């Protein structure tokens, strides 16, 4: 039996929002499900799952379909995504490479 994954309400709503935005973009372009699925290289059933906000869909597929129909993946501002990536990687470089948990013994003999 497959293990059932649980998600926060916020994550579920975000997936549904992405799905309806994709569906809106597809319909605004007057593309059928079959047409968009062929453009994305996926099955029509997978596209239907994406448009419903199914959390089991691969994030790469969701991003690709969203891009095809013109859904903005991140806030559009003056900085292109490549600059956002570089900026975020610079921030990561300032942080420790390893996160170590403290192994202090708990003193509960009070």
Model features per residue range: what roles?
Residues 21-24, 30, 36, 73-85:
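Localized chelating/binding microdomains
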């Amino acid at each position: 039996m497959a293990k059932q994954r649980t998600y926060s309400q916020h994550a579920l709503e975000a997936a549904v929002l992405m799905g309806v935005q994709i569906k809106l973009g597809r319909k605004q372009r007057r593309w059928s499900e079959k047409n968009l699925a062929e453009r994305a290289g996926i099955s029509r059933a997978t596209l239907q799952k994406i448009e419903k906000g199914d959390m089991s869909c691969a994030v790469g597929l969701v991003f690709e379909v969203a891009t095809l129909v013109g859904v903005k993946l991140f806030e559009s501002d003056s900085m292109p995504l490549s600059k956002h990536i570089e900026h975020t990687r610079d921030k990561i470089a300032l942080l420790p490479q390893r996160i170590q948990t403290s192994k202090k013994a708990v003193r509960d003999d009070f």
